Amino acid sequence: MGALGEETRKITDSLDEVGNTTAAIGKGFAIGAAALAALAIITAFVQEVNHSRQEPIQLLLTDTNVLIGLFIGGMIPFLVGSLTITAVGDAAYSMINEIRRQFREIPGLLEGTGKPDNQKCVEIATGAALKKMVMPGAIAVFSPVIVGFSFGPEMLGGLLGGGLVSCILLALTMSNSGGAWDNAKKFVEKGNFGGKGSDLSLIHI
């Protein structure tokens, strides 16, 4: 879109690789810090409930409410993750449709003589990033509130515990798989397995 040269592309690819390495390291620390913070929140929740009532809360697997909360908490991260991935796919398709429209309607764009409407593509990306994240954010925020007020602290404790374990495993899986896919794409684009423009390269894109 910027009509920059091949040398600029090589520089930005190198910077992107450095950024991916830095992000991969940072993600590990971020996941660990988030896990410790969530564990501290669960501990604070148990202590606060024990202070507010006479009988201390017991989060036992033999308790039906705790077990149901564990299943709900383990399910929510996968639901939020699926909604987020779907949002990314929808935004990508919207961007593709807009680019195709510009190729059809803007004279000389395909030949390189016309000027694309970059602002429209930016609006699609930012709009999708804001609108499509409303539902995942609402689920993450309101599900503990609804469960806690509707079914009691035992089920809420189970939800927090199940969500903690599920979130850690899902975050590690997504982080490693996403980094592996991105590096595999760059490996192909550097000339391996057919190089850029091959069928394998198109599949990676």
Question: Could you describe each region identified by the protein language model?
Answer:
Residues 203-205:
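Conserved small/polar residues in nucleotide/adenosyl-binding loops
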Residues 112-164:
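C-terminal transmembrane helical bundles of large multi-pass transporters
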Residues 17-65, 74:
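Phosphate/diphosphate-binding loops
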Residues 1-13, 93-120, 179, 183-199:
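Juxtamembrane inter-helical linkers in multi-pass membrane proteins
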